[in-house]
Amino acid sequence: MNSRLLLEALQAAETHHASLFEEVRTRSVDIRSGMDNPLLTAHRIEIRQLADQFLAQPIEALPFSAFRLFQVNGSRKEFEKIYFDRRRRLAAFAIAALLEEDAAFIPALEDIIWAICDEYTWCLPAHLNVQDSEEEDDAPRHVDLFASETAHALSEICHLFKDRLDPQIVKRARHEVIRRVLNPYMQLKRVFGWETATNNWSAVCAGSIGMAAIYMIQDSRILMPVLNRVLEAMACFLEGFTEEGACLEGLGYWYYGFGYYVYFAELLKQRTGGRVDLLLVEKKAQRIAEFPQFCFLQENHVANFSDCGRTSGIQPGLFSRLCQRIEQLRIPSLSHRSNSIDHCGRFATAMRDLAWTDYALLKKREGLPLRSEFLQEAEWMVSRCQVNGKLFSFAAKGGHNAEPHNHNDIGHFVWIVDGVRWLEDLGAGLYTRQYFGDERYSILCNSSAGHSVPIINGCFQSEGEQYRSQVVEVGIQDGRDRFLLDLRQAYDVPHLHKLERLFDLDKQQGKLTITDSYDFTESPTSITERFITLYPPEVGKEGEIILSASDGQKLRLMYDARQLNAAIQTAEHLDHSGNAETVYLVDLKSVDTARQQVISMTLEPMF
């Protein structure tokens, strides 16, 4: 859409400004009147409990000692815990003030708005370049993910509560949004790095700024160039997805980035009276909306390649709106709902869970088929089947080792049986300076050492786009799935001429066989087949390793004991929340030094 058409669309609906996001007010009245909706009832109860908890606690200060820790030792969690609790408090009080009659929530909301306006910067220390004196001096006006989100939250609150908040609160909040975010964005003579990014940053930052601008700027002639710039960033965001709609950052970042794309798109649609509808005109966006159908493996378990959690709830507001817009969309089980306000206090998501959730529609769309699928550009394979009443899910990937939020994981896979993740992807680790710096691939969950892939001559996979796989064969049949990858280019190993990995899933018996075929120009010094699990393994009879779950379920890993020696070691993994986990590394080392070797291993449940 060109500038003239955008301006005409904005001007034609300029009088709609007062009714923006009116659906949240309507929904609040419905809930107070006794609307029967189990998802919204749970949402309301959770919000009320959180709001009451915050009412009993003072607003915690953001001390310099916490702010400087990232610069000193790379730690983020101390500052971010306080920072995000403030955003959770903001969201809880705003939603509680909409839903409840308790008069205490408005003064509490005013206090947290005032405290946020007092903050030195809305940007996280991890996103500030503290080595750049010019940027450090302008930290209050630096725009990152969370400065943008804060600007949107405050502008939306001012819009919804302008007649209930003290005028001084509204005036100050609007002033800070303009000073810290809108003016730097509108007046900057060079682009922010995230404006041309093809990851979640472009959508979250631009989408938040776009929504803040829609609320704050009524004059269409001033608003239009801001939204033009936002739309350019949104176009870059869509480029980061494969043509089939896959998000290589993982499902968590799909929720984050695409969520903000949808939030902005829907508000822009309202502001233009339906004349600009990104979800209608962007066909790729519709394919992106279907990505969770591929990613959810069973119940709340997901294919969690890259920096992604192993399980995920659904966001009922976002899914409701997408189901309204896309007829063929299916959703996973409603039994697993995301927290009403997440650990970062994402206001936009919590508000739209309130405003958009359509329980009846979600129930109609609930349930994913037991089928196998392949994403050609992403090189992801997913299989789902049922054997003897048990659900089996398998996911494997090719790709390359410079993907967004990359892990060195070419040829890696996940294996789940009836809710037990036997062969695991560790997912995202604890975010620190080191995690996104030169030490990234020394961290277990990012290195191929922490994935179920071979170790050749003591070498792990290398990072970089040149380290990649090639798909040789994909076979999807009623009783068997096959996925054959050429992994030769994933390793910087001299004399490795060929390495092919075949995944062969027998969907009649629930057996997965992995076969690695090697060809060297000189004899290898070592070949180790590594498997990653969180369940204690023990060597059973010859050629068997048994994994045991606490509920009594067991899995058998079978191999040729004449060809492979088994060894088991443990390692520690810090998950995304900083919790320590014991990881079991099951290594099957070849006793042979022949140049050509074929090694097969089979996984099967013990019924």
Task: Please state what every model-predicted region is.
Residues 258-422, 477:
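Carbohydrate-active enzyme catalytic cores, enriched for enzymes
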Residues 33, 40, 80-286, 290-293:
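Aromatic-lined, polymer-binding surfaces characteristic
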Residues 423-428:
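Catalytic Cys-His active-site segments of thiol-dependent hydrolases/isopeptidases
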